[in-house]
Design a protein with these regions (language model features):
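N-terminal secretory signal peptides that target proteins for export/translocation
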Residues: 1-15
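Bacterial N-terminal signal peptides
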Residues: 16-32
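An alpha-helical repeat/solenoid feature that recognizes helix-turn-helix modules
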Residues: 37-50, 64-94, 107-139, 143-193, ...
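Structural recognition of the beta-strand scaffold that forms the well-ordered cores
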Residues: 81, 119-120, 174-175, 227, ...
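Helical hinge/lid and interdomain linker segments adjacent to catalytic or ligand-binding clefts
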Residues: 94, 378-464, 468-469, 513-514, ...
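Solvent-exposed loop/turn segments at secondary-structure junctions
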Residues: 106-110, 124-127, 147-148, 161-164, ...
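Aromatic-Pro/Gly-enriched surface loop or interdomain linker
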Residues: 354-414, 418-422, 517-518, 525-634, ...
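An acidic, glycine-rich "communication" segment
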Residues: 450-549, 578-583, 673-763, 773, ...
């Protein structure tokens, strides 16, 4: 027996010493350079900061940047727009000066480019203050649209009298009108109808677009066509059918064949390092202008990929290489406008900054018909409303379920699934969907079911699918006290819009509505709101607010930029050196031992990345009386209800924690559950006579960065509460962590957090749990692990 104990002690100590040695050596390791396609959010932020600093240095004393006389205010408006999207607020001195300059410009000499860029800058900065200038520019742009001849619906450089439109001027005019409509300025439906006809007539037989009719397609103009078709369709009021005061949700929706042809064509021609054009097209030199068009086409269409190209990552990779290291500028080819650093840098910043907007939701594309997207503008309008409510730029995507991996789905915190008929998902699609939820994703589904639309097939199929994928978690109605009804603003449950949910991963991770929600969402566009009857406006408002609440509940408003989105544990770092890989399992008990199933793995993954050393993230559950327990230097324990160990388990744990083996236990109460906390304290205190629970003092090494961890003197502790207007929120205090320790003969053997770590590690910030913020939960967990490894 003594020999066996000594052997187990040797195994434990060897495991510890191996990783500690690797940690220390890690200080000396040269950091690898990211490979192509592995661009980081940190590198993008630095590039944006450097480009922003360049533009600020180039600003003239009067607030302008180098202008072109034929486009007064154009360059200044472009630079202002780029800086605003890069994160500078309107109150910033540079922005304030540029806005004053823009307001002072003589607007009697307008051009399409300048008026459009000025409108976009003012709409993004101070639309309330400058609404008169915005309206003036809108009226000018509407009057400048060509209304006769083959170029009808397009724009030229200045007046419609020229009768010669081009697709570049036309796209900028539409961008400006769209931004104005978004801030409440009324725009002419006739203008939008003519613009739609114009773009349909401009499309090449291949699906692409050239600079003018008859030109071969180019990259920049095809992107202009994609964006313009989307903008026009969004602003055409006749696409919203209302009969007898009710929305007709099952009416045929515009499925733009022209748009699909353009996107399919572009998937075969995409390039990030040059503007694909015809052989003699001067547009091939306008690379930064082209990339700004790529960003716009990708974002507005909700596409992460064009063909098999991840357009944002490929574009970022190229732009980071092209940025001048000293000045922070980008400079284009000579003898064109992009040779002016302010112009090229502005286009580059617009690509980098707008392209990294957090993805808040993704449409789940399945099947061969369009039932998955019965109301194609619905999610877009919900995201628009959410942006304004949260004062945060957001975007959405579409994922093809036939091709998507779990990691692809995890790029979005919310996956939206809708339909009318049977889902008919394959075994692989079901497995990926199940893994998405168990890996922390949130599924938001609804049936396209309304007075005029039968969605019983989808409703029946979805319920069966949930029962198949989550047999232990039934789909149940969310009662009036569920936080989802209060997550952003208070919404009363309605029999017209009931919500059902499935509990998984510390929260309700699946929400289902048997009624069509997206139909009402698409009616939230300002152009439609003006035409809706009062009762219908209220219905739309309630449906939109419910959608915002679901997004708020699912994300906690804690959204990450594209390149910051999580990946599931993969074999790269953790499995490349199996002989030195540390394995740390989780203890089994009857109090919800695996309810937050991903929390421990996420912490191990974060620690592995922080140390740049291999720690196995393979899920392992082990019983306290398993003979292998002594092989592991550290084990994890959490739960959400009371529990008791058996006499055999108590003896095994006492042996594990003894001075002979010196095992270490890390524990937390899931969602701050008090029953579990009470059980844990009692069960462990009874294991070894003389052991004692005490709060770990703030000056303990575990609370410091001594072991290559973090200073924990101030962390964010969050407590759920309701605001005065009955909105679910939380009270956040800055404090030192409340951690309890079990000391055995003067040695710290168990560290326990009575406040939640697990749900924060699994799903991020929660509206339901008393616990630490997601960032601080990770830091606390890493510190505890590092301390345990040193002991």
């Amino acid at each position: 027996m003594k020999r066996k104990s000594t052997g187990r002690l040797c195994q434990v100590m060897c495991s510890r010493l191996t990783l500690v040695t690797m940690i220390l050596l890690g200080y000396l390791l040269v950091q690898p350079t990211p490979l192509y396609g592995q661009v980081t959010a940190k590198a993008v932020r630095q590039a944006i900061d450097n480009g922003t600093a360049y533009l600020k240095r180039q600003q003239n004393d009067n607030g302008s940047w180098g202008e072109y006389p034929e486009h007064p205010g154009g360059v200044t408006s472009l630079c202002t727009l780029a800086l605003l999207n890069s994160g500078l607020p309107p109150s910033d001195e540079t922005i304030s000066k540029s806005l004053d300059y823009i307001r002072s410009i003589d607007r009697s000499n307008k051009s399409t480019y300048a008026a459009s860029l000025m409108t976009m800058a003012l709409c993004n900065a101070t639309p309330e203050r400058d609404i008169a200038i915005i309206r003036e520019n809108v009226r000018w742009l509407e009057n400048a649209q060509i209304t006769e001849g083959p170029a009808t619906g397009g724009w030229a450089y200045r007046s419609r009298l020229s009768k010669r439109a081009d697709n570049s001027n036309t796209q900028f005019a539409l961008l400006a009108l769209h931004e104005a409509a978004m801030v409440g300025v009324e725009t002419s439906q006739d203008v939008w109808r003519r613009a739609q006809t114009y773009w349909l007539n401009q499309q090449h037989s291949s699906g692409g677009f050239g600079y003018v009719a008859g030109n071969l397609p180019s990259g920049s103009m095809t992107c202009a066509g994609i964006s313009s078709l989307i903008i026009v369709e969004e602003n055409l009021g006749e696409t919203l059918p209302v009969v007898n005061g009710r929305l007709q949700c099952c009416s045929p929706q515009d499925d733009s064949i022209a748009l699909r042809r353009a996107i399919e064509f572009w998937g075969t021609r995409f390039a990030a390092r040059f503007n694909p054009t015809g052989p003699n097209d001067v547009g091939k030199h306008y690379l930064f202008y082209y990339l700004y068009g790529v960003e716009r086409a990708g974002r507005l269409s909700g596409r992460r990929f064009f063909g098999d190209h991840d357009w944002y990552r490929e574009g970022v990779d190229y732009l980071l290489q092209r940025q001048q290291p000293v000045s922070g500028a980008w400079v284009g080819a000579s003898q064109i406008a992009e040779a002016q650093g302010e112009i090229a840098t502005s286009f580059a910043l617009l690509f980098l900054s707008k392209g990294r907007w957090p993805v808040v939701a993704a449409k789940y594309e399945y099947g061969t018909d369009r039932q998955w997207d019965q109301n194609p503008k619905g999610l877009h309008q919900l995201v628009r409303t959410t942006e304004k409510r949260w004062d945060q730029k957001l975007t959405w995507q579409t994922v093809n379920s036939r091709l998507a991996s779990v990691n692809d789905l995890l790029q979005s915190p919310v996956l939206v699934l809708s339909g009318t008929d049977s889902l008919n998902l394959s075994k692989k699609q079901k497995e990926v969907l199940q893994d998405y939820v168990t890996q922390g994703g949130f599924l938001f589904a609804w049936a396209n079911q309304s007075e005029d639309c039968e969605g019983a097939g989808f409703d029946e199929d979805f319920r069966k699918l949930m029962a198949e994928l989550f047999p232990d978690s039934p789909l149940t109605a969310l009662d009036a006290n569920h936080p989802i009804w209060f997550a952003d603003r208070a919404v009363k449950p309605s029999p017209d819009r009931p919500l059902l949910g499935i509990q998984a991963c510390c929260r309700t991770s699946i929400v289902y509505c048997p009624a069509n929600l997206a139909c009402a969402w698409q009616a939230a566009h300002p152009v439609f709101q003006r035409e809706l009857p009062a009762a219908l406006k209220n219905e739309v408002s309630e449906s939109v607010q419910l959608g915002v609440n679901v997004l708020a509940y699912a994300t906690g408003r804690n959204l990450q930029e594209k390149l910051d989105r999580p990946q599931i544990a993969e074999a790269s770092l953790s499995d490349e050196r199996p002989r030195t890989r540390l394995e740390l399992p989780k203890l089994i008990h009857e109090g919800g031992a695996d309810e937050a199933s991903r929390a421990w793995g996420n912490l191990l993954q974060a620690t592995s990345r922080w140390l740049e050393q291999p720690i196995s993230q393979k899920k392992q559950l082990i019983a306290p009386d398993d003979p292998r327990l002594g092989n592991f230097p550290i084990v994890f324990l959490h739960g959400r209800s009371s529990f008791k160990f058996s006499s055999e388990e108590r003896q095994a744990l006492a042996d594990y924690l003894s001075d002979e083996v010196q095992g270490f236990v890390i524990a937390d109460a899931i969602c701050g559950n008090r029953e579990f906390a009470t059980s844990l304290r009692k069960e462990f205190a009874d294991l070894i006579p003389g052991s004692r629970w005490e709060r770990i003092p703030d000056n303990h090494p575990l609370m410091s960065d001594r072991y290559r961890g973090f200073d924990l003197s101030k962390v964010s502790l969050r407590r759920p509460e309701r605001s005065s207007d009955d909105v679910a929120t939380f009270r956040e205090t800055q404090t030192s962590p409340v951690l309890e320790g079990l000391w055995i003969d003067g040695r710290l053997a168990v560290v326990f957090s009575p406040y939640d770590l697990s749900c924060a590690l699994e799903n991020g910030n929660s509206l339901e749990c008393v616990g630490y913020s997601a960032v601080d939960a990770q830091r606390i967990g890493i510190n505890i692990l590092l301390y345990a490894l040193q002991m």
